[in-house]
């Protein structure tokens, strides 16, 4: 029996993790489209080695590329199980595929995801940030920066009649800034990582 188990709501628990090397294991999760949360846990067969944690990773395999692993979080002897939300990770994968023009069948669609477990030193694992938190932090930072710029630029707004007739400054209509602000907000809501492409 494996050290690790996986639970997906409505399915039997899985413990068929396959060793990739001495510190890394994988398990396939079929029909991933309907899965929003999953649980990874220690089965209790034996404890993890002292000073180690099990870092948990998610990958949505792509037939045309190497797996991209996203860190979900960790479990260890003092925290033997954890629930991970993968709905946002699946959505960001779909948005990334659309951004790269892979919408209408130019890419094979995989219905099997993989969960990876990597035994790593506790200090290394403690310094990692889960993928979902990073995406949310990026979105929040982008929105705050957007609001700050909008407020700053709008504080300099003047009516056309107040612009000096002989001025070396370039003036931008405020409606242009408002349109940019609205478009940026919309795009940020649709895909917080749109600016990367």
Curated annotation (Swiss-Prot):
Q: Which domain of life is it from?
A: Eukaryota
List GO BP terms, alphabetically. protein import into nucleus
Among InterPro entries, the record links this protein to: Hikeshi-like_C, Hikeshi-like_N, OPI10
Kindly list the cysteine pairs connected by disulfide bridges: none
Q: Which Pfam families match?
A: Hikeshi-like_C, Hikeshi-like_N
* GO CC, any one term: nucleus
Q: Which family does it belong to?
A: Belongs to the OPI10 family.
Q: What is this protein called?
A: Protein OPI10 homolog
- Organism of provenance: Drosophila melanogaster (Fruit fly)
